[in-house]
Amino acid sequence: MTSTLKAEVDLHVHSLASGHAYSTINEIAAEAARRGLRGVAMTDHGPNMPAAPHPYHFECLYMIPDHLCGVRIFKGAETNIIGPGQVDLEDRLLEKMDLVLAGFHRHCGYGPSELQANTRAVLELMENPRIHIICHPGNPEYPLDYEAVARQAAATGTALELNNSSFVTSRVGSADNCRLIAKLCARFHSPVSLGSDAHIAQSVASFGHALDALNAAGIAPEQIVNRTLETTLDFLGMNT
């Protein structure tokens, strides 16, 4: 399918700091520039993930330049949901970041997965203005009431991520859920984000499958929060 949608910023990328990713921030920025991106978000895993960085890593994100290789660098985290409205980084650290993703992951402190409890956890998180994006919500290991989540996204302005990796290598069984989420987002005009979930530089800006799903669902361009650098800055409440 030919895509009529786009994203100038990749809002979900991991560096060596995540422990199971394989490129430096400089390598990622260089590849992002080569692929024509105007921005890339460094969203290494929160500390509850095995081999993830210590919280002090996130304390020191200010050391990263705002621009590398001509690409805007957004400094953030992919936090782990650990309970209703709870993630594995303190609010004082979340406040320091340009953006915060939140998602369910194995072995990270979340209890037994059940649709009602999972949905409650996400809906409460979306009330927190420090949480910008719910990442890979189509993961079948953590079922959700997708309609309730899409409605909440529209109400709170929290973006739901279409994660390209969910269609390819990760979270087997996610693809149909992601397509349904895209349709619900189109129905309720919920904000969506695109992320490669790259764990190596060569995967940065890989959006093809996610874009196809958004096109098929009838998502309007203005629903994609990272369609341009300017819309990304606006979504994150950043002026420059």
From Swiss-Prot:
Enzyme kind, highest EC tier: hydrolase
Entry binding sites for Zn(2+) 3: 78, 105, 136
Gene3D superfamilies (UniProt xref): Metal-dependent hydrolases
rRNA-binding listed as a keyword: no
Binding-site residues, Zn(2+) 1: 12, 14, 78, 197
Keywords: Hydrolase, Metal-binding, Zinc
Superkingdom of origin organism: Bacteria
Signal peptide feature range: none
Protein name, entry field: Probable phosphatase Pcar_2586
Organism of provenance: Syntrophotalea carbinolica (strain DSM 2380 / NBRC 103641 / GraBd1) (Pelobacter carbinolicus)
Lineage, broadest ranks: Bacteria, Pseudomonadati, Thermodesulfobacteriota, Desulfuromonadia, Desulfuromonadales
